[in-house]
């Protein structure tokens, strides 16, 4: 049976994530129905809008539920920021930052499992005006 990954989001917004997970052999559950998350082996928190203040209860519930049961969580862009805020970290807004037309592509350095999956210098896209300021203790 394929591993199930719960992709927290609205259908129609995350086709790239969906396609990548399915091509890697995962069965993806894309919805906001918390009960569907109970049978999933992993959680993907994708990118999205800004985080202003505490996280919505749904995201906090999902993070707590997956962390308590030691199921893997992957936060991408806003998703990583959500994990940081949830566990006590802070974000920094970059006032006046102008978002470019299109995504910026730049190389990164991967280690461990990510390097085995993606190579040592995968290119990533980014378009942010918020960033992690103080890293939450569980993420250090």
Give the positions of each predicted feature.
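N-terminal beta1-alpha1 cap of cysteine-dependent amidohydrolase-like domains
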Residues: 1-74, 78, 85-92, 96-123, ...
């Amino acid at each position: 049976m394929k591993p199930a990954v719960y992709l927290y989001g609205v259908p129609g917004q995350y086709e790239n994530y969906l396609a990548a997970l399915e091509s890697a052999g995962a069965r993806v559950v894309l919805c906001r129905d918390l009960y569907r998350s109970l049978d999933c082996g992993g959680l993907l928190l994708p990118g999205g809008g800004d985080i202003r203040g505490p996280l919505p209860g749904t995201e906090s519930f999902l993070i707590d539920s997956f962390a308590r049961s030691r199921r893997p969580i992957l936060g991408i862009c806003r998703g990583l920021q959500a994990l940081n805020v949830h566990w006590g970290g802070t974000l920094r807004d970059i006032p006046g930052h102008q978002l470019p037309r299109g995504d910026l592509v730049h190389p990164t350095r991967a280690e461990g499992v990510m390097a085995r999956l993606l190579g040592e210098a995968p290119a990533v896209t980014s378009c942010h005006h918020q960033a992690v300021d103080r890293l939450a203790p569980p993420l250090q």
